[in-house]
From Swiss-Prot:
It is found in: Cytoplasm. It comes from Bordetella petrii (strain ATCC BAA-461 / DSM 12804 / CCUG 43448). The lineage of its organism: Bacteria, Pseudomonadati, Pseudomonadota, Betaproteobacteria, Burkholderiales. Pfam families: TACO1_YebC_N, Transcrip_reg. One of its GO terms (molecular function) is DNA binding. Residues 1-21 are annotated as: Disordered. GO terms for biological process: regulation of DNA-templated transcription. The keyword DNA-binding applies. Keywords: Cytoplasm, DNA-binding, Transcription, Transcription regulation. This is Probable transcriptional regulatory protein Bpet3099. Belongs to the TACO1 family. HAMAP family: Transcrip_reg_TACO1. NCBIfam families: PRK00110.1, PRK12378.1, YebC/PmpR family DNA-binding transcriptional regulator.
């Protein structure tokens, strides 16, 4: 994969997310509300809420906003009646795409997702059409220069499944979703902070796109991520370092 840089792809995605901070806050608030409704208002006993809380903190969301979202969810107030829906489809070059949504209107959401795919050269698939290409797991990615031995020790003692370091020095830790909170706590205790972390759908194989195909795929991803009901978009695509 000449020109393919994991770190460049990570930074590229983070840059896109930072540019959409207002929308990111909306999505995090929705996640906090749903998590509090499903598992209660205490992040210490609700791992999903803890993860959403941490996302909010990383996005510099004021604590008052977080608390209001928790209260809405725990109290069953207006705005908490969302359901989670997953859509699967294909992008440029047959690249697999998973779109996770929270919605109060499935009919609206599927129409918007289908339109985004169709307008940007992709197509919405059937349930199960691409999910097998991804692994549901916890992921932590550390920047080049992070002490590999410290990461390795903390990760494995906390039950992580795999620790890998690429040629750039990017360290990736993978764990079972159920072990995510324990691994995160182990990193905190060791004074480590991941550049990217979360429970994700990790592609088992990658599709590298360059040139015009990469531009078209980026437009598709932007269109999907820009939809109000979309929480996360996962894809098998990696972009050439020059994109």
């Amino acid at each position: 994969m000449a020109g393919h840089s994991k770190w460049a792809n990570i930074q590229h995605r983070k840059g896109r997310q930072d540019a959409k901070r207002g929308k990111l806050w909306t999505k995090i608030i929705r996640e906090i509300t749903v998590a509090a409704r499903a598992g209660g208002p205490d992040p210490d006993s609700n791992p999903r809420l803890r993860m959403a809380w941490d996302k909010a903190t990383d996005a510099n969301m004021p604590k008052d906003n977080i608390q209001r979202a928790i209260q809405r969810g725990a109290g069953g107030a207006d705005g908490a009646n969302y359901e989670e829906v997953r859509y699967e489809g294909y992008g440029i070059g047959g690249a697999a795409v998973i779109v996770d949504c929270m919605t109060d209107n499935r009919t609206r959401t599927v129409a918007e997702v289908r339109h985004a795919f169709a307008k940007n050269g992709g197509n919405l698939g059937q349930e199960g059409s691409v999910a097998f290409m991804f692994k549901h797991c916890g992921q932590f990615v550390f920047a080049p220069g992070t002490a590999e031995d410290v990461v390795m020790e903390a990760a494995l003692e906390a039950g992580a499944e795999d620790v890998t370091t690429d040629d750039e020095g990017v360290i990736e830790v993978i764990c079972a979703p159920a072990d995510y909170a324990a691994v995160r706590q182990a990193f905190e205790a060791a004074g480590l902070k991941a550049e990217v972390e979360g429970i994700i759908m990790k592609p088992q194989n990658e599709t590298e796109l360059t040139g015009e195909d990469a531009v078209k795929m980026q437009k598709l991803l932007d269109a999907l991520e820009g939809l109000d009901d979309v929480q996360e978009v996962y894809t098998t695509v990696v972009f050439d370092e020059a994109q």
